């Protein structure tokens, strides 16, 4: 909506900063937007809110209905088509916002903190809907969020920004597995907390590390990370047999990102 003071905004190979106002208006129609606080018109029903962009574009009423009803069905609100926003839950309001954003057949869908105002259960339902839209419509979705669990569940790639500067980017699995920037590490702190050895256990382990084992060998503390198919392979068992080792597992967890275990 606002032109940047410097740099470029390139969408689908086109630099938006070099377009005229008329060209920019046309290009905006190919970009849908989901807002954090829904931004629905209280005087319009579910149908009316979804139909609004099409009415503003001058589409005939019969064509609008042909377009709107399948979208309302897609987001699971067929039974609420004539209800007003005041009669809907937060999750239902967000679904209206999603349907409205899809009404203009966008190539890209921007989701600006779309789940931050929702409860955990509704958040999960909304994320599943967005994944469904991504797969069924082949639509690119750009998620703007500070919730790393949202990134983990729905995104393929991630870009981490700090004070307007990109500090890290890459495949979600790789960034979660090995974050390079301290900002990313801090953001992932909560998500990775379950993988951190408790402080009390660390002190006990330090004592063991300074004490030779029964075979006279020095004890070591090692963190192993398995990604993808390697999570199901008996790596520790093979190492024990091959190198005549004893081992004790202090902490372990299996997580999943985009159907990939790690």
Where are these regions (language model features)?
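A short, proline-enriched helix->beta-strand linker immediately N-terminal to the Walker B motif
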Residues: 103-107
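Conserved ABC ATPase signature
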Residues: 23, 84-88, 92
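Conserved ABC ATPase "signature" region
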Residues: 14-15, 51, 55-58, 62-79
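ABC ATPase NBD coupling module
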Residues: 16-32, 56, 61-62, 175-179
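A short, surface-exposed alpha-helical micro-motif characterized by mixed small hydrophobic
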Residues: 151-153
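ABC ATPase "signature
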Residues: 169-170, 178
